[in-house]
Amino acid sequence: MADLTTEPISEATQKGSWVSGLGSLLSYAFVLGLLGLLGWGLIKVNSGQRDSGMAPDFTLTSFDGETVTLSELRGQVVIINFWASWCPPCRDEAPYLESTWRKYKDKGVFFIGVDYADTEKEALAYIDEFDITYFNGPDVGTIISQEYRMDGVPETYFVAKNGELRGTKIGPLFPPELDQRIEELLAEPYAGE
């Protein structure tokens, strides 16, 4: 009987082991590639702005301690604006948002400002600088912005009286865009009226 520990391994056996190992490695790489593509596809399905379907419900606490829950605003047109004090385009649209709010606040329209990734001190200074009177609060933990799949600030969501999203605006709003959107939403019939 031959001693297996001292017998040399044949060249064919070495080549066969190498080919077998390479085949296994390629199989693993293929499976990992497929899993990666599947995961990427799932991420892409769940990303991008929300601009239709029911608006994700949330409760926001304002800087002065008041709360608002989106689903409790049924029957009103709701404008949700994500902003930050450090955002130059947010500063560009702030006067228009406030003047539009004042124009429509008694006509069945509710504005919600969601402050994104900001300090309270800076956010309050921004609100004071632009004399903003509509409801505003911080997105603590960025929970609301994640739910809305927000890309950046400013970003505005238009919610119909029945709670459905009717579109998204990425970037600053300028006259007469917001007025037009609000008028369209106010004209929509609502079963609760």
What are these regions, as identified by a protein language model?
Residues 74-76, 106, 132, 150:
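Active-site acidic short loop of glycosyltransferases
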Residues 57-78, 101:
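A short beta-strand-turn-helix
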Residues 79-81, 113, 157-158:
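Hydrophobic beta-strand core positions in alpha/beta domains
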Residues 1-57, 193:
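N-terminal targeting signals for export/organelle localization
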